[in-house]
Amino acid sequence: MSQQSSATVARGVTAGLGLGALGVLAFSLSLPFTRVAVEDLDPWFVAFGRAVGASVLACGYLRITRAPRPDRAQWRRLAVVAAGVVVGFPLFTSLALTTSTAAHGAVVIAVLPAMTAVFAVLRAGERPPPLFWAAGVGGLVAVVTFLVSTGAVRGALAGADVYLLLAVALCALGYAEGGALARELGGARTICWALVLSSPGTLAVTAAAAVTHHPHASLGAWAAFGYLTAVSMFLGFFAWYAGLARGGIARVGQIQLAQPVLTLLWSALLLGETVAPASIGAAVVVLACVVLTQRARARGGTGDERMAVSRR
């Protein structure tokens, strides 16, 4: 490889890492701002209303780029993506954060990369080494142990804890299917088409929620809702997928490990929440398990570095 080519590759990797970090930064604020929004707004309105707003932006993007329509098989797969990242994760985190703190939720969300890898492995029919499964189960056990020992109901899972676990499971499924579909449609178009596909349902639920609980909120709650709509549900995906395309999934994907740490930080700085030592300890254990799943999968020859992410 020539010196000029090496420099070009290096610049691409640097740009990818920067974009990936920007995406993680955007997503790390989702839980704190959801917590702010649901203090004044109905959680169903927050969850589905943000998708409605993002779908308007998605329609504009698809029209401007003249994106071709997905085929029938791709529409079915987009339904899985929509169920996970457009509906499932926003809904269950919104419901959970009406009673739980963002810092508490951050520990649960820390296991998301490992659960995404598990769904990706199952979907692809891969056979990773035993360490992969042990680390994945270990991360989940660490999260459940944390919830049972520190939740509102000692010795049992509270309702908010169940919502958080459902949010992680559905989001992981959506990420895994979306990652595979992005190789065909492109990352930006994948999330945009998922938003468009879900728009009739999200619009109906948003309207019903607005009628049932007329949205009256403070300026801060509306600002948080605007962030969730424009950034968490739309622009954050653009930066994240662009970073993966430029810098490679193996390199840029590691940045996601910083997301729960940043969320804990924002929870303390922006919301004044107390981050207990148990939360920090649990997050460290979960992140260690996530690292083990990624390395075990890579050593088994099934790592994400083999995936080609479209630049579209």
Regions found by a protein language model. Name each.
Residues 47-49, 86, 90, 104-111, ...:
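Helix-helix packing/entry segments at the starts of transmembrane helices
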Residues 58, 79-81, 119, 128-150, ...:
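Hydrophobic transmembrane alpha-helices of multi-pass small-molecule transport proteins
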Residues 37, 46, 50, 96, ...:
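Hydrophobic/aromatic residues within transmembrane alpha-helices
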Residues 57-69, 112-134, 261-280:
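C-terminal transmembrane-helix exit sites in multi-pass transporters
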Residues 25-31, 59-109, 145, 229-247:
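Specific transmembrane alpha-helical segments of multi-pass solute transporters/efflux pumps
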Residues 2-9, 49-51, 148-149, 221-223, ...:
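C-terminal-most transmembrane helix of multi-pass membrane proteins
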Residues 14-19, 45-60, 64, 80, ...:
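Hydrophobic alpha-helical transmembrane segments of multi-pass integral membrane proteins
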Residues 1-50, 54, 95, 153-180, ...:
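Glycine-/small-residue-enriched transmembrane alpha-helix faces in small-molecule transporters
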